[in-house]
């Protein structure tokens, strides 16, 4: 039975963005369509055989209030998907990402995009594979607490479980429900960093 890596893409990239661009400088936005995810994960998972790598992303749709930004994000995701597939990942588009306008207390409108349903798809896929006896080990690259119930179910199905998180604010609940915890160091994220986009 295979060892499978489940990557919660938005969760992973959000954590990495904070490490690579902690001040949230717009001109230094990280271009993940150039990031060497494969080398990073090969390093932190050294000694562990990974037979399949699943990278989950929220499915983007164009919303009438956010048409321009939605189309930009869809193109960014297309480039990211091509980049990930070239590195041996199977990209799974799940749930949805919707843009909407929020008004702050001062009356300013902000365009916000929220992802929903990806964690549900990861949980369903893990449990389905476990019930089919089609998985030996699940490596969970996500710090989403909503996955704890699914990970507990994997335990009852006899599946080995590894939580892959970050040294900054690891998820204690996922650490508790897995056999092993591997934490990615900030220096390792930086080691395989893509060129940050700059508008010089």
Model-derived regions: residue spans:
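Nuclease catalytic cores that cleave nucleic-acid phosphodiester bonds
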Residues: 89-200
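Domain-level signal for Mg2+-assisted phosphodiester chemistry and nucleotide/NA-binding surfaces
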Residues: 1-111, 160, 165
């Amino acid at each position: 039975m295979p060892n499978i890596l489940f990557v919660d893409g938005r969760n992973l990239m959000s954590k990495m963005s904070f490490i690579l661009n902690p001040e949230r400088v717009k001109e230094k936005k990280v271009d993940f369509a150039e990031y060497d995810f494969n080398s990073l994960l090969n390093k932190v998972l050294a000694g562990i055989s990974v037979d399949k790598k699943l990278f989950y992303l929220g499915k983007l749709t164009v919303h009438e209030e956010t048409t321009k930004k939605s189309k930009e994000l869809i193109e960014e995701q297309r480039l990211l998907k091509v980049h990930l597939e070239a590195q041996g990942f199977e990209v799974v588009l799940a749930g949805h990402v919707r843009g909407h306008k929020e008004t702050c207390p001062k009356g300013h409108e902000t365009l916000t995009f929220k992802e929903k349903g990806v964690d549900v798809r990861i949980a369903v896929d893990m449990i389905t594979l476990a019930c089919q006896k089609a998985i030996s080990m699940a490596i969970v690259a996500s710090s989403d607490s909503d996955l704890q119930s699914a990970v507990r179910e994997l335990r009852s199905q006899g599946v080995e479980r590894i939580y892959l998180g970050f040294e900054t604010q690891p998820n204690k609940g996922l650490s508790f429900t897995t056999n092993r915890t591997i934490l990615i160091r900030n220096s390792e994220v930086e080691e395989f960093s893509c060129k940050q986009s700059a508008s010089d």
